Each structure stands twice: as structure tokens, then as C-alpha cells.
Amino acid sequence: KNKMDLIESVFKNTNVNTLVIDIKTDNGHVLFETDNPLAIEMNNVRSKYNKASLEELKNDKNLYLIGRVVVFQDPLFAKKHPEEAVFDTAKNTIYSQDGQYFIDPSSKKAQNYIIDISREACELGFDEIQFDYIRYPDSSNQYMKFKDESTFENRIKNINSFLSLAK
């Protein structure tokens, strides 16, 4: 059974008015066809739906669609653009915590990429975007290196910078 069959059974057996669908996953995959040059360069598009299928789903089920975008946890972006990733000075490579790779939240290139993907998703028909992992790695590892010194003030500045772009 595919995911849509499971979702259909939920619709039949419950009263659902909202659905959250991944747009950009914690693996870094974008789940719709996009012309975004960075997504194409990273070969991370895994098309699961398109504008027509979303419109059909919304209209047939009278749904409010929320698109989930994983923001700064992105192994594909971090590996393809290590200069934009959190760096581990002890291992002299990009930082990984339990297999999770993080983009440096101060990276304008990464911020713009995520915003561009999110805007494109809105054009597909999503009513709202839910940003997830809009944070720094939760480790206090002394070997993590960011472009900006990792102070409380810089962390707030960088997260707010992203949020300002998202408005």
C-alpha cells in the first residue's frame, strides 16, 4: 500500500480538515518537481506530488494543506556545500550528530535556498508553511565551528535573519 492509500483510509474513517505534507525532508529531499538550480545540482528532488494532485486533494477533501520544510538539518546540502555547513574542528570535516548534518544558520545561500523552495511550494497550493529544525544543533560540542562566533546574540541574529526572509 502506498502512502496515499493510507491517507485515503484516514479520510474515510475520520473527520479531517487539515493535512501536513513534507515539502523538504530531514534527509534534504525536495518532494515536488522544482526548477531550483541548487536542488537540481544536489540531485535531491524526489517528486511525490504536483500542483494538480494537490489541488485535487484539497478540493475533493476540502482540506487546509500545511507544507513541512526541514530547515537547517540537511545532509545533502551540508555535504554538497561544506563551506555552508557546521564544521567539526576535531575531525576536520562537516559536523554530524547521530547522523544529522546541519547547515550553518548564518549561511545566506542556505537561507535563500530554503525560502525559494518554500515559496515555490506555496505556488503549488499549500496554505501554510511549517518550518521545522529552525535551530542550531542541540549539542554543546566545543568543536563545532560556525561562520559567526556561537554567541547567544549571534544565534538570535541568524535565526531572526531567516525568519525575516520568510515573511
Segments (PLM) and residue ranges:
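Active-site neighborhood of glycoside hydrolase catalytic domains
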Residues: 123-124, 128, 132, 137, ...
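The substrate-binding groove and active-site-proximal loops of carbohydrate-active enzymes
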Residues: 1, 35-48, 98-112, 149-156
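Aromatic- and glycine-enriched glycan-recognition loops and surfaces
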Residues: 2-13, 40-61, 154-161
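Catalytic domains of carbohydrate-active enzymes, especially glycoside hydrolases
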Residues: 3-29, 122-129
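Aromatic- and acidic-residue-enriched segments that line the glycan-binding/catalytic groove
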Residues: 31-42, 74-96, 139-150
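Active-site-adjacent "subsite" loops/lids of carbohydrate-active enzymes
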Residues: 1, 72-123
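Glycine-rich, aromatic-flanked loop segments that form ligand/cofactor-binding clefts
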Residues: 18-23, 46-94, 130
